[in-house]
């Protein structure tokens, strides 16, 4: 009898605790899965390190802009700095939305050892840091180690594209300026063409109905390219443009293009005057080569 009474008491106590927890939980606002258009911060990210052919070391950094729509400009200075050796170590100052991988590389001496390279960003009232280091389990390959379905021989034989950008004299707000890139590649990996998705597996933008049915805060469902670069138009060599540094985004037309006779041309239109660093990325399906060009935009 005593055991039965004790069991009932324990059961009643547990039930009361569960009810209390549920009641308290009902008052809690969970925001982990909320998507914010704007007002959120940028988290710098250390992605790993790689030893170069000359013995020095490259540290790779990216970021997460927690906004789904708002792009941020954080100039070099108190709110965007890398130490030691900073504040400017070649980091980005313009931040597209969401996750961006291997945005820039900082080269450090071979004897970097147990030192750390600290990237600090201040945005939306929050201070975030990323710590670059040489821990053995953070060593990566420059291409990310991903060859997809390519053969080992093809991946090993592949070399990065060559990319040369023509200088840009300047630009005027609202007027398109021409961007020329000379690009070549070894033809590897062999282009395989786009894979056609199965019925029912198409991207949301191909299945959505009338414009009036679309949520106003979901630009990715509208098929809008807010990345500044866009996806590759097809398998094979292509050149993609983004803003690396600058006070605002630029409208690239087209944002990604395939070269013709070794030339890839696009235009950029700016809405805000200032100094911009535009980045072109030549991608062959596995490896990428980056080059920058500076543009001064006036009214």
PLM regions: where:
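Residue-level recognition of secondary-structure-to-loop junctions
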Residues: 51, 265-272
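Low-complexity "stalk/linker" and mucin-like segments enriched in Ser/Thr/Pro/Ala/Gly
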Residues: 92, 200-265
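Extracellular acidic, Ser/Thr/Pro-rich low-complexity tracts
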Residues: 65-67, 183-190, 223, 227-232, ...
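Short tyrosine-centred short linear motifs in exposed loops/low-complexity segments
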Residues: 55, 100, 110-115, 174-175, ...
